[in-house]
Design a protein with these regions (language model features):
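Short glycine/proline- and aromatic-enriched beta-strand/turn motifs that initiate or cap beta-hairpins
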Residues: 19-84, 113-117
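Flexible, solvent-exposed loop segments that connect beta-strands
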Residues: 34-57, 85-104, 126-149, 174-178
């Protein structure tokens, strides 16, 4: 509640700024994250004493919508909402199969500094990381789901020409988990 109050006070204070301009935007692209499938396969192999084969996704889609508030021509603030597709892994052990799937969503807030056609940004995010796993043994399927939430930092940059942009953003600690980072490469437009 305190964070929301501070944000509302900040917006109220800044709306009187004569150079202020608010634009909306959308970005879409690919996000890479390491779901540590190799480590999981090794744990399963050690526990079962069997060879484990596995397949996993290294990337999935991500979309982001945002509001861009210009304090000046060089300094902006962005408030965004992002959502990813799922990263999946499948493990096979002599007649049994295990799967896991992860996706994320959240909000982010960043200060963006523009220099000519190049921009850099740094800020923070509050995100939720959702996981689902299933294990099939002898035709019986066992399932579990879990969600964690938390915050982390983000840094990125890119090129913006004529209200279109191409960029890269690194999100740390997705869902508050220190081992869950992601890299987002995108194409976007500002309206």
């Amino acid at each position: 509640m305190k964070l929301i109050t501070k944000f509302l006070v900040l917006i109220f204070f800044l709306t009187g700024h004569s150079l202020a301009e608010v634009k909306m935007g959308a970005e879409g692209g690919l996000v890479w994250a390491d779901i540590r499938a190799e480590e999981t396969a090794q744990i399963l192999a050690n526990a079962s004493g069997s060879t484990v084969t596995y397949e996993y996704d290294e990337a999935t889609w991500m979309g982001r919508i945002f509001a861009d508030y210009a304090f000046s021509n060089e300094v902006h603030a962005e408030l965004g909402y992002f959502l990813t597709g799922s990263l999946d892994a499948t493990y096979k052990i002599s007649g049994s199969q295990a799967t896991e799937s992860y996706d994320a969503m959240g909000i982010d807030l960043a200060v963006v500094v523009h220099q000519d056609d190049i921009y850099f940004k740094a800020g923070m995010h509050s995100s939720e990381l959702n996981g689902a796993a299933s294990l099939t043994i002898g035709g019986t399927k066992y399932s579990i789901t879990e969600s964690i939430s938390g915050s982390g930092f983000l840094v990125g940059g890119g090129i913006e020409l004529d209200d279109t942009r191409v960029g890269l953003t690194y999100y740390s600690d997705m869902g508050g988990d220190a081992d869950s980072d992601m890299m987002f490469i995108y194409y976007g437009a500002v309206f």
